[in-house]
Structures are given as C-alpha cells and as structure tokens.
Amino acid sequence: MPRENQKRGRRATEKAKKEASKRKRDEGIEEPTLKRLKPSADEDNAVTAGADYVPLEGEEYDDQYATGAADEMPFYGLLDSEEQEYFSRANEMLELNQFGDAEERRLFVDSVFREARGKELKIACSQSCSRLMEKLISVSDIHQIWRLFNKFIGHFLTLVQHRFASHCCERLFISAAPGVTQKASKTKSKKDDDIEMDEDEEPEPELPLAEMFMKVVEELQGNWGYLLTERFASHTIRVLLLVLAGEPVDVSSNDSVVASRKKERLGVVGGETQENNPSGEKRSVPESFEATLKKVMQDMVSVLDDTYLRALATHPVGNPVLQVLVRLELSHFGKSSAKQPTSIIKRLIPDENFEDDSETTRFIRGLLYDPVGSRLLETMVRCMPGKMFKSLYRNYLRDQMSSLARNQTAGYVVLRVLERLGRDDLHAVMEQIVPKIPSLIERSRTIVPKVLIERCLARGVDTKPIAKALESSYDSDPARRLEQMLRLETAMADNKEKSDKNGPPGESNPGSAAAEKLHGSLLAQTIVTAPGQLSELVFSSLLALSPEVLLSICKDPTASRVIQQALTSPASSPQFRRQFTTRFTSHMNELALDSSGSHVVDALWPATKDIYFIKERMAQELAQNELALRDSFVGRAVWRNWAMDLYKRRRGEWAAKAKGRDITNDSAEKPKSRLDMARARYAAKQSEATGANAVAAKQ
C-alpha cells in the first residue's frame, strides 16, 4: 500500500547512499512486518494532517500479499550481452526513424520481432528494453499485435504489477483496442516474403482479440481488490476498463486519468501506427464487453463497504481508478443507473438533499479541499444527473461559490460547476465572484475569471461587470495593464535580477512564473473574444504599446498568442485592425524569421483581408527579403502561407486571393449591383401580389 511503499522508497534511498546497507536485501521480508505492528503513529499523524486517509479494509493483508507476491514473482530470465546490444541498436533506429518509406520500416519491425521470438517476456520486464517493446507495439500492425497478445496470455497478473512490463501491457491494450471487432486473418500476407515464411513460420493464435481481452479479465478476476491500489497495475486497469467500454483512451492529454502526468510519452516521431481509429474517438466493441465491464466494475467495489469506498476517493493511487468507474457508470451505462442503491455514485452520495452536517455533506466538504479527492468531485460534478447536480448546487455550493473560487484546490471544482449552470444561476454566481476578481488576479488565480467569461459568452450573460472588475485589478495605464496581464514586468525584473546578482534569487521558482505567464496569456486571449467593453481592455492596451515592447511580445512563445487572437478575433473592429496592422509594416522580415513571430505574420494575412493596401505593402516587404526567407525554415512557411510565388508571377490572381475572392468562383461570389437588387425586390413584390390574388380568388 502507498504508506508501506513510501517506507520502502526511503529504504531504497538509504541503500543507494550507503553501500553497507545492501545486506538489508536479505532481511527485506521481515522489515515490513515489524513496521506494520505499530501503525498507530503514522495513522494518527495522517488524520491530524488533514489527509483524510482511511486505510482500506484488509490493507495489511494486501501488503503482505504484495510483499509475498514480489518475492514469488516469476522470473523470465535476463537478456545476454549480445541481445542487449542488438535491441539497444533497434531502439535507437526506431527513435531516429530514418527509414526510406513505410515498407522499409515494416521489414525492420518484422526482423526485430523475429529476433525477439521467445524472448518477449524478458524484453517486457527489462529496464532498458521495455521501451523498445512499447515502441514496437505502437508501430505494429494488427497481425503482430495479435501474435504478441497471445504470448502475454497467462502472464498478465504478473506483468501488470511489474514496474516496466505494466507499461507494455498498457500500450498493448491501447493498440489492440481498434481490432476487437475484427477477425484477424490466419493467412499471413505472403506476397512479399514467401521464402522467409518457410523458415520462420510460427503457429497462428486461435483466439480473436476480443476473446483475448476476455482471457485477461479471467486472469485478473479475484484480484481487483488490491490491483486498484497497486501503483503499477492501477494505470493498466484504467486502460482495460476504457477499452472494454469502447471509450477514448488518450494518454497524451493532460486531463487524462489513464496515466500519470510523469509518464514518458514513448513513440516513434512521425511514425504511422496500426490504429485506424484515433485513440481520442469512441469505438464499437462486441456485445460481450458490456456485460463483462459491468461485472468487473461490480467486483471491484463489492469487496469494499461504503466507508472504505469513500476512503478510496482520497487514495493517491485508487482515486484515478474510482474516477474512471464513476465516469463509466454515469456516461456509459446511463445516468439512470445512479438511482440504483448499489451504484457507486449512490454509495458515495446516499443523501441527495445535502442537509447540514450530514454524512454526505461532510464527505463533499472533505473532497473540496483535498488535492486528490477534488479530482473525483470534478468528475462527479461533470457527469452526475441533472437533478442531483441541482440539489448539490442549491443546497450546498451556491452560497459559498465566491469563497470556493479563491481556494487553490476547490477553485477547480467551481470551474466544473460553472460549466453546468444555466443563465440565471450563472448571472447570480457572477455577481458573487466579481467583487473577488481583484484578489483572484493578485493571487494569480486567473483561470476562474477566464472560465467565467467563457460561460457568460456561451449563456448570453452581460460581461460589463467583469470588465469593470478587471479594469480595477490592473494599472490604469493601458500599456502597463497588458504588461501586468502577461506578466512581462515580472519576467523583466527576474531577468534583471539574474544578470545583476547572478545568484539563486532570480531562479527561485521558474515553473510557477511560467505557469502564471501562461494563465495570464490565456485570460487575455479569452478577453479579446468578448465583444464590447471587455475586449477594449486588451485592444486599447495593444495600441498603446511601444514598438519595442510589441516586438518582444510577438517574439514571446506564450504572449504572442494574444497578438494572434486579437488579429483574428471576430470582436476586433476594422478600425482597430487598420490602426494595429500598420505597426508591423516595417518589421515583417524580422518577425517572419522568428519562430514565434512567424505565426503573427501568418495571422496578419486574414487580419488584412479588407485592408488590401496594407497587405500589399507587407507583401512587398517580404518580397524584398526573399533570399533570407527561403534560407529559413519558418521563413519558407511564411512565404508559402502568403502565396508569395503567386504574388511574383501572377499579381492579379494574388490580389483576388488577398481580397478573399476565388478566381474560379468569382462569378458566384461577385456582389450584386444596385440594379440586380432592385430587380430582386421587384420580383419578390410580384410574387407576393400573385399569391394574394390567388387566395382572394379561392375565397
């Protein structure tokens, strides 16, 4: 369990520091037992610290089982030095991805699989070669996935708990998911390598992929209780649940509950995978999967009573699994399942009235301020039925939305609540939060005003109060206002401090400074999408910037997004774009050769669609620096996006394209003349008169 793992982790650190402590490896079986005999001190400290941690029932048994399982873990052998060297070179070649075409890479992958035949389990459990196995799986076709899956059957209970093999299982499930509805052909394609098949022929698996997934469930059956909180198996269990449900499995998303945020994103750069369906889309699955999924979910939570199920909500390892279970129960099986007394959401929240000082209210309050539990509450707020959400909001959350928004942890739950509120409730919440916006800005909690603006725009709520609050939160000088919003002042101050002192004060926390800068940029980008007084806060600041500051913003990877959004936003008026775009005319070459500034130059193309003379002046400046642009990667992209070859050779076609007209469909897009519009009005009147006469004749 996590607490015991932490103790083992501390011992591992001591072993690394002191060579003499390596003898403890032989005594490793007895030490956890001794420490489990006196858990009261640790448990008391955990409760008083506000961690809301309740040990799961049978936790000591699970720890003993896990310790014993680690000692009795099957050993599949080690790769010899020649095999290690070969697979290391294969890993480097896949990483470089310097194959001539897809066929050359396919032949290389086939050769690696032939070399790995009979050693698949060794490679999956190898610290250095398990990464190769993950990459091989990601570039394999469905037939190779089918063969490898068959090799792992019978060993999944061991593999999912292994530090390295568990990631191979996760990648295998994701890659095999699109093929569960296919019947893999037992006749391997022999059209390219008939001769090799005679030498390397291997018996074909008898089971289709769907049946193989059923075998995985059978292997893990009866062990769900401790696998939920096993640090290596838990992320594989999450993937398995999503595959059985046919839900998207996206491990690359920051919002994903599939994998840890520290997980390595292994793959082949620019490589094509065997997946026909992207991992971000829902898939069709066999009918047997739904019944299996329902049984697996019931087995996972049936061994826990309500108290320990709630304790799982604040468990660092078990919480993400519980999030997946709640999401699947409410979204996959329908929100009507929440009415069943044995449902997970009903066991977590038995009292839908949320009365004061009730058990349910105390549980929700504990989740709100818990860094781990708040993520489960976000999932519940996003997925729970409308009736339950309204009761939660009106009976508990409504009166404290402003105070919750100021809290660093509970504020994220507030964002999910804002996404579900109607127009009237959203207007009431806005009136609560608006007075707190200055303090939120001061504490760099800009994500709350950002989401509030987005929801007000979506629901049609007036944003003038937000504009006034933001105006009072920043400097009255428009130029300094944007610098404060984008955190340019603090960045310049940090740089100056580093150069003057050349010490650690300037390097105190660069991660938080970058995060604040990013959130400030996102807030400014959202503001410029709102018409009226709100967007004028940024538009007026952009016009007040000095040329030097404007260029520095354009070259900043984070802040330049605000310039791009302001140029292309529907809220920007022609008057603003006419004044603002002229400030770039003498800096086109400098910006086009910069990695961030080139995107600003690209945004100037649609921004000047109704200001042709400015666009033509910019094109002339680009044409004068043709050689420099063609020698630069980003410069060539700008040259292509501005259609400069067309500008040099067929100026008339370029002019039509610059004005937003297509030459081939010019007749269809040509605006009507006054005579044409008069004829259309006359024809409409004639048709109305004819219709009236026909009605009178019938009467």
Curated annotation (Swiss-Prot):
GO terms for cellular component: 90S preribosome; nucleolus; preribosome, small subunit precursor. Keywords: Nucleus, Repeat, Ribosome biogenesis, rRNA processing. GO terms for molecular function: RNA binding. InterPro entries: ARM-like, ARM-type_fold, NOP9, Pumilio_RNA-bd_rpt. GO terms for biological process: endonucleolytic cleavage in 5'-ETS of tricistronic rRNA transcript (SSU-rRNA, 5.8S rRNA, LSU-rRNA); endonucleolytic cleavage in ITS1 to separate SSU-rRNA from 5.8S rRNA and LSU-rRNA from tricistronic rRNA transcript (SSU-rRNA, 5.8S rRNA, LSU-rRNA); endonucleolytic cleavage to generate mature 5'-end of SSU-rRNA from (SSU-rRNA, 5.8S rRNA, LSU-rRNA); ribosomal small subunit export from nucleus. Pumilio repeats lie at residues 115-150, 151-186, 359-394, 396-431, 544-581, 583-620. Residues 194-204 have a biased composition (Acidic residues). Transmembrane segments: none annotated. SMART domains: Pumilio. It holds the Pfam family PUF_NOP9. It is found in: Nucleus, Nucleolus. Residues 1-27 have a biased composition (Basic and acidic residues). Residues 1-47, 184-204, 494-514 are annotated as: Disordered. Belongs to the NOP9 family. RNA-binding nucleolar protein required for pre-rRNA processing. Involved in production of 18S rRNA and assembly of small ribosomal subunit. This is Nucleolar protein 9. It comes from Emericella nidulans (strain FGSC A4 / ATCC 38163 / CBS 112.46 / NRRL 194 / M139) (Aspergillus nidulans).
